[in-house]
Swiss-Prot record:
Segments in the Virion surface topological domain: 17-392
MF-aspect GO terms: host cell surface receptor binding; sialate 4-O-acetylesterase activity; sialate 9-O-acetylesterase activity; sialate O-acetylesterase activity
Protein's UniProt name: Hemagglutinin-esterase
Miscellaneous note of the record: The sequence shown is that of Quebec reference strain.
Gene, per the UniProt record: HE
Intravirion topological domain: 414-424
Length: 424
């Protein structure tokens, strides 16, 4: 009890002397078991191949280039590689996962499947995709891409129906209509297989609206059927709109198995790529750094929408992105955020990263790691310390049990001694 009171007193004295230990706006790690996924702002290979080699192009400290803990590609993102022919095989593994990518698919690219489509739907898809990625990488160590083999018994081939600018959708694949079908009112199937990973993130997408072809309107209908378990996953078009709709995607987390892709109307779609999730781990929140352009280009907030506690911590700069290499590369604020990767930190929270694990001026919310157990609330004259009550409650219970044991032992020996005297 004396030690506890001394700890409380010392902590309050430290607080009164101004030891704030505030949360810092960085991404960091508990130890060396971490990994970063990124784009050009952390792509060391891209900088090496430029002439001259100018590391001001990156927000990442070049001291980390040889760490072996980075998977980044200039001009790309995990979402872009997942859906489109512009592909990079993001691959990495760690207990603590950090993401700093996403701006290579934003409203600036204005992607939509058809001329009457909607980029807003694709921003919605982006948010749903990253929600699944962040949630699952809080419980899995390893992320990579795998191809999904499929077998379609018809003669029709996949078609590039959904494209805009340089972006061509190839996941899921569209199977063209068979030549002997006069319209799109038909049912068609394809087998696909998932193997080699613990779980997979795969797309299930439909045109949610009335799709017009040759004066006829069609309602999209797509299903995946797990032939091993009998579980079926499906989407049907529910909107009556004829313009301004686009390819709505849901992102399913599926186990290994044999599947059947089924279309009851319009074109059959079948997944061709999947995020491969491997090696379950203890729950560890991921960290996400906002990925946005200079204000001269339009960005979105979908990674922020997807990154929610307790599974994700979001870090952002309070100012416009203004790079020193060019306006979109080498920003001081984001370089500062990534500087936390140069050192270990004991505690992570929604507010930021704590450098020390004793006392803080801010109580950590959604904390992870070895976090401060006390927050000092400074009044003008007297520091008042507020502590996490759980350790005190447990200590009180242990002290109470110890007192009871001592009393029982004393009574036992007193009775035993009295019995011996009586016998004598």
């Amino acid at each position: 009890m004396f030690l506890l009171l001394r700890f409380v007193l010392v902590s309050c004295i430290i607080g009164s002397l101004g030891f704030d230990n505030p949360p810092t706006n960085v991404v960091s790690h508990l130890n060396g078991d971490w990994f970063l996924f990124g784009d050009s702002r952390s792509d060391c290979n891209h900088v090496v191949n430029t002439n001259p080699r100018n590391y001001s192009y990156m927000d990442l400290n070049p001291a980390l280039c040889d760490s072996g803990k980075i998977s980044s590609k200039a001009g790309n993102s995990i979402f872009r590689s997942f859906h489109f022919t512009d592909f990079y095989n993001y691959t990495g593994e760690g207990q603590q996962i950090i993401f700093y990518e996403g701006l290579n698919f934003t409203p600036y690219h204005a992607f939509k499947c058809t001329t009457s489509g909607s980029n807003d739907i694709w921003m919605q898809n982006k948010g749903l995709f990253y929600t699944q990625v962040y949630k699952n990488m809080a419980v899995y160590r390893s992320l990579t891409f795998v191809n999904v083999p499929y077998v379609y018994n018809g003669s029709a081939q996949s078609t590039a129906l959904c494209k805009s600018g340089s972006l061509v959708l190839n996941n899921p694949a569209y199977i063209a209509r068979e030549a002997n079908f006069g319209d799109y009112y038909y049912k068609v199937e394809a087998d696909f297989y998932l193997s080699g990973c613990d779980e997979y993130i795969v797309p299930l997408c439909i045109f949610n609206g009335k799709f017009l072809s040759n004066t006829k309107y069609y309602d999209d209908s797509q299903y995946y059927f797990n032939k091993d378990t009998g579980v079926i996953y499906g989407l049907n078009s529910t909107e009556t709109i004829t313009t301004g709709f686009d390819f709505n995607c849901h992102y399913l987390v599926l186990p290994s198995g044999n599947y059947l892709a089924i279309s009851n109307e319009l074109l059959l779609t079948v997944p061709t790529k999947a995020i491969c999730l491997n090696k379950r781990k203890d729950f560890t929140p991921v960290q996400v750094v906002d990925s946005r352009w200079n204000n001269a280009r339009q960005s979105d907030n979908m990674t922020a929408v997807a990154c929610q506690p307790p599974y994700c911590y979001f870090r952002n700069s309070t100012t416009n992105y203004v790079g020193v290499y060019d306006i979109n590369h080498g920003d001081a604020g984001f370089t500062s955020i990534l500087s936390g990767l140069l050192y270990d930190s004991p505690c992570f929270s929604q507010q930021g990263v704590f450098r020390y694990d004793n006392v803080s001026s801010v109580w950590p919310l959604y904390s992870y790691g070895r976090c401060p157990t006390a927050a000092d609330i400074n009044t003008p004259d007297v520091p008042i310390c507020v502590y996490d009550p759980l350790p005190l409650i447990l200590l009180g219970i242990l002290l109470g049990v110890a007192v009871i044991i001592i009393v029982v032992l004393l009574l036992y020996f007193m009775v035993d001694n009295g019995t011996r005297l009586h016998d004598a």
